[in-house]
């Protein structure tokens, strides 16, 4: 059954405007750098091609093909620019209707699967994060906007010939404590998590239509140790810690004493330690890192791991009314902080919108909000892998 045409959702492709859908889903998430869409409809274009002698007048719209550039607007507000990635169709037994579904990704989708610099260069000197990302994104027709401090230039930044565009940029961004996010329409954003507020709160008895929640300890730990090694006299800075000995007291963070004499050639082993007071039983974990000049300390990294693990340990999904909220009727968007009241999941405070899904179907318009703890996407200046290891890996 075809629902009445909704002028609120419009797909622009091949010089046509389509707004007659059975189902629409548009998704953006901090977990996936590019947004995606899925639309189901009666494919009048292919039906006309199949039954050309029987169809009159011409169909409402022509057939959509994979690879076509497209854009999607909600209430005439552009929210998605990208490409049709796949078209699937099914014809009924009587040959009277062809049901089709098209899916695709936004303009940043090609950054996930395509090479960063197929023809070189593979190494840059004294380049900023913004310049590096712009150099990679420019051939794809994608802009870059810095919305936060991107830090100092990299003295040397190298990638492998086979490195994909997005992983290469993310590796560099982590060294500057920056989060990469697609705006869905034109640009890759260099930003921080939760820098803006959502248009409204999320609350039972107010706008929530249901809930699913997860509160997990599976990847949370009572004690997080970060161990790294400074460069020694022999230039070794591979991040390999010296043999570990038991701490004097579990959970105290007491690190084994290091002998400057014995470690002189290989470097000094450094240990950071942070605790999560919400984890009430002994659950220790050790993370190994490189420690180099200019990067965060092992103690800062230990505290950061605890914050991120805590934020990702809470996950809630809320369908809410419509796509818009608040006095300005603004769209719900990812990477915004929102006040959340959910007595069922025992939440009463700020949460971060990890993802949004705009839906339109026989039940009308709604948004599914994916919320996580506000610290889930915190960033910290992570140390770079040594050039020595990088070069060995790319030989």
Where are the language model's segments positioned?
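Polar/acidic, low-complexity leader/linker segments enriched in S/T/G and N/D
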Residues: 1-30
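Surface-exposed cap/loop segments at beta↔alpha junctions
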Residues: 2, 53-144
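Short beta-strand-centered interaction patches in the first periplasmic/extracellular domains
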Residues: 2, 79, 88-111, 146-221
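Extracytoplasmic
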Residues: 6, 21, 34-36, 79, ...
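Structural motif
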Residues: 13, 74-75, 204-206
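Short beta-strand and beta-hairpin "edge-sheet" elements
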Residues: 19, 71-104, 181-183, 338-370
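An acidic/polar, Gly/Ser/Thr-rich interaction patch typically located in mid-to-C-terminal regions
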Residues: 26-63, 206-395
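Amphipathic, non-transmembrane alpha-helical segments in extracytoplasmic/periplasmic proteins
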Residues: 33, 37-39, 84, 104, ...
């Amino acid at each position: 059954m075809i629902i009445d045409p909704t002028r609120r959702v419009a797909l622009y492709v091949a010089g046509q405007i389509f707004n007659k859908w059975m189902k629409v889903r548009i998704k953006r998430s901090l977990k996936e750098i590019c947004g995606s869409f899925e639309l189901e409809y009666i494919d009048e274009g292919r039906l006309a091609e199949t039954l050309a002698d029987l169809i009159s007048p011409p169909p409402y719209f022509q057939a959509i093909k994979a690879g076509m550039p497209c854009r999607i607007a909600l209430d005439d507000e552009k929210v998605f620019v990208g490409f049709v990635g796949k078209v699937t169709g099914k014809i009924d037994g009587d040959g009277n209707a062809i049901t089709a579904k098209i899916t695709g990704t936004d303009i940043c989708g090609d950054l996930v699967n395509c090479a960063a610099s197929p023809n070189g260069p593979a190494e840059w000197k004294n380049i900023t994060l913004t310049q590096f990302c712009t150099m990679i994104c420019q051939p794809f027709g994608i802009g870059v906007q810095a919305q936060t401090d991107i830090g100092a230039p990299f003295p040397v930044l190298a990638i492998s010939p086979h490195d994909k565009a997005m992983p290469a940029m993310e590796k560099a961004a982590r060294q500057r404590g920056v989060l990469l996010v697609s705006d869905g329409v034109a640009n890759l954003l260099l930003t921080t998590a939760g820098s803006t507020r959502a248009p409204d709160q999320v609350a039972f008895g107010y706008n929530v239509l249901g809930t699913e929640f997860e509160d997990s300890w599976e990847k949370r730990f009572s004690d997080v140790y970060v161990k790294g090694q400074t460069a020694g006299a022999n230039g070794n800075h591979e991040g390999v810690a010296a043999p570990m000995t038991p701490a004097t007291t579990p959970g105290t963070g007491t690190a084994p004493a290091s002998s400057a004499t014995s470690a002189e050639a290989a470097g000094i082993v450094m240990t950071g330690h942070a605790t999560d007071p919400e984890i009430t039983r002994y659950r220790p974990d050790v993370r190994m890192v490189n420690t180099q000049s200019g990067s965060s300390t092992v103690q800062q990294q230990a505290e950061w791991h605890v914050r991120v693990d805590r934020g990702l340990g809470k996950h809630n999904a809320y369908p809410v009314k419509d796509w818009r909220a608040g006095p300005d009727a603004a769209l719900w968007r990812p990477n915004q902080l929102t006040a959340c009241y959910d007595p069922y999941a025992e939440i009463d405070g700020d949460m971060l919108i990890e993802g949004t899904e705009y839906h339109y179907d026989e039940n009308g318009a709604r948004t599914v909000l994916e919320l996580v703890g506000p610290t889930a996407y915190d960033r910290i200046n992570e140390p770079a892998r040594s050039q020595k290891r990088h070069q060995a890996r790319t030989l």
